[in-house]
Structure formats: structure tokens, C-alpha cells
Amino acid sequence: MNNLEKTYKTELVNQLQQQLGFSSIMQVPKLTKIVVNMGVGDAIRDNKFLESALNELHLITGQKPVATKAKNAISTYKLRAGQLIGCKVTLRNKKMWSFLEKLIYIALPRVRDFRGLSLRSFDGKGNYTIGIKEQIIFPEIVYDDIKRIRGFDITIVTSTNKDSEALALLRALKMPFVKE
């Protein structure tokens, strides 16, 4: 069991239950999954960009990514419907907890000029999305081996439908939010 997961199950569940005023432990919000998505617009011209993105996402998450296809054709970008244009990974259980711990304690402190995560990135349904500008903040990525610095999105999906409860959960997990 991961340190962050152990802390959540032993200490944070009871704290959140009291803080949010729930009568049952089952009402306490929990992490459902983490989705890591990388759009590769350069894959229209050359498939090697997509292959390197798939490899980098595999190194970062420890799980094989799935290539995503374009839904619609856009003639100005020379994009056809069904063309491979990105990749994504859905993390659950142990890999989700280890990725979140790595994100909070290793990757985010390595971001240049990091002042905290924005509180505006909640979607109104209890999910939080982080935009990462460079994949080199993760220790698995060797700077000399990458062909291009590329960003990606990390969506943290919780079991609650309220942003305030999701914020309380993520704050309890020590997510570095901007000071209000």
C-alpha cells in the first residue's frame, strides 16, 4: 500500500468525515481515477511524434497508453476523422495513488516558477484538471532522449459531485494550491 493511500485510509477519511459533517464514512469523497491525456498535433505530419508521446506517457505513468483518434475532420489542419492525434492513460487503484504521490512530492516542485495550483480548474462536478506544460518535470524522462517538449493534462476524478468537497479532499492529500 502506498504512503499517500495509507494516510488517506487511516487518518484523512475520519478528518474529512468530521470536517464535511457526514454521518457515514461511505459519504466521504475518494479518488476514483486519474486520466492523463496528451494531444499530439504534430502526429498529422509524422507518426514518429505520436510514437515518442506514447513512449513518454508510458514512462511517466507506468501503464501502456491508448492512442486517441480525431472525431471530426478539420480541413484547415489537414486532419481526417479517425486519424491518430493523441494518447491517454486511465490510472486506478495502486498506480493512481503512486502517480498522485509522485506528482505532488516530486514533479510539481520541479516546475519552474511554481506558485501553486489554480483553484479555478474544477469542472463543477468535483473533478480537477491540471495542465502540465513540460513532460521533463517527471524524473523518468531523460532530457537528452526527448525529441520535443510537450505538455499534457491530468484530470483527477473524485466520487463527489461538489467542488467544495473535492477541494477539501485534495487539500487533505496535500495538493499545493495557490494561497487565497
UniProtKB/Swiss-Prot annotation:
The organism's place on the tree of life at top rank: Bacteria
Q: Name one GO cellular component term.
A: cytosolic large ribosomal subunit
One GO MF term, please? RNA binding
Q: Which UniProt keywords apply?
A: Ribonucleoprotein, Ribosomal protein, RNA-binding, rRNA-binding, tRNA-binding
Instruction: List the SUPFAM superfamilies.
Output: RL5-like
Disulfide bridge map: none
* A Pfam family annotated for this UniProt entry: Ribosomal_L5_C
The UniProt entry, under InterPro entries, shows:
Ribosomal_uL5, Ribosomal_uL5_bac-type, Ribosomal_uL5_C, Ribosomal_uL5_CS, Ribosomal_uL5_dom_sf, Ribosomal_uL5_N
Any one GO BP annotation for this protein:
translation
Instruction: Describe the function of this protein.
Output: This is one of the proteins that bind and probably mediate the attachment of the 5S RNA into the large ribosomal subunit, where it forms part of the central protuberance. In the 70S ribosome it contacts protein S13 of the 30S subunit (bridge B1b), connecting the 2 subunits; this bridge is implicated in subunit movement. Contacts the P site tRNA; the 5S rRNA and some of its associated proteins might help stabilize positioning of ribosome-bound tRNAs.
Q: How does it assemble?
A: Part of the 50S ribosomal subunit; part of the 5S rRNA/L5/L18/L25 subcomplex. Contacts the 5S rRNA and the P site tRNA. Forms a bridge to the 30S subunit in the 70S ribosome.
Return the similarity comment. Answer: Belongs to the universal ribosomal protein uL5 family.
The protein's matches in HAMAP family, at most eight in alphabetical order, are given as: Ribosomal_uL5_B (MF_01333_B)
Provide the protein name: Large ribosomal subunit protein uL5
The major lineage groups are:
Bacteria, Bacillati, Mycoplasmatota, Mycoplasmoidales, Mycoplasmoidaceae
